[in-house]
Amino acid sequence: PRTTLVALENTHNAAGGVPLTPEDMKSVADVAHGYEIPVHVDGARLFNASVALETPAAELVKDVDTVTFCLSKGLGAPVGSLLCGSNEFVHEARRWRKMLGSAMRQSGVIAAAGIVALETMVDRLAEDHSNARRLATGLAEVPGIAIDPEAMPTNLVFFTLKYSNHDEIA
């Protein structure tokens, strides 16, 4: 089958939370667009990438066609995500949403929480990253845990248990 979409995630949990740079994003987008294939970014942790790279989120996604990002993951809003793209794309997405019956009534209060998250919580992600490194540093002191705190640039902490049998540590 022919590829119809290239999807990226920034940051990606399987990559240890290491952010894709603007150059990485552009390289992928250039190849995909050369084949007339659109590029979508799952930006659930896009703002974490932005903070870690000290690069505006808009700069990270300027070469892609569409992006979604979550207002609750990391930013602290109770719910909500945004779908961003060209005016034509957003118009079509709204049409599909209405055809499929998806809607939320009286969502102004929840939308207000999303706006507060965007306006005030992005800067606090640096604290989240610092706390993750602090946790990783503490875990590195625990016998039986293998972890490299320096290899964690964002808020995701990964470690390996050195023991394969829990009886060995009991």
Language-model segments: residues:
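Conserved PLP-enzyme active-site core in the AAT-like
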Residues: P1-P149, T154-A170
